[in-house]
Amino acid sequence: MLSSPEWLALEVKYPDRLTAFYDAFLELDVLEERDGETVLAAGETELRLRAPGDVPRGGLHTHYALTVPDSEYDDWHDQLGERFDLVEHTFGDARSLYFYDPEGNCVELGERPLKAQSSGVTGLFELVLEVEQLDGAVEFYERLGFETVDDGREEGRVRLTTGKFDLELWSPRLGIADARGGVHVDFGVVTDDPSSVAREVADDALSVTSVKDGVRIRDPDGHYVTLVG
């Protein structure tokens, strides 16, 4: 059974410059700096800023969404609106704002009713992957443990979830705020039994590799998902 997201990696030319950007505008602290990569704390999720180099690479032009407390949403909107041409969209009773980082990633901040002590960015709640064959990609991620909750294949998009983390699979297209799904994205998801889950997709995966964190799978579109035990 899949659970919450552990990390999202983005490929960036200069990690130090993007670190400064995310510090200035989203107040994300540095957890770790290593050769060619800086790890930021996006609440409970790691945001890994990775320079071009070895595989797995980080995602390019990746749309992803972070949660903020609903009590702080208006403050974030006002603060970011001074610097960015924001796009806003409402999903039911929840509002989201969209802006771009210097590398062309579309960042979404979505309000959520969170505990009173929660403040700032609290975690990753959505990630969008670009895929070549939507039907096959949906089947792959359903067998991995995601559940389809919004089937918009006619529009070129399908939304799946673990219950704690949403994954959108898009055919090449533009979404809200002209966002795109990421290519060669690298992300981690928590699960109780990485090896057992990996066996469900082993025949169709491009590779399945045991790593320190768990089991790393390369899907048919070249995205890497690590099942973290």
Pin down the residues of each PLM region:
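Histidine/lysine/aspartate-rich catalytic loop segments that bind and position anionic ligands
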Residues: G156
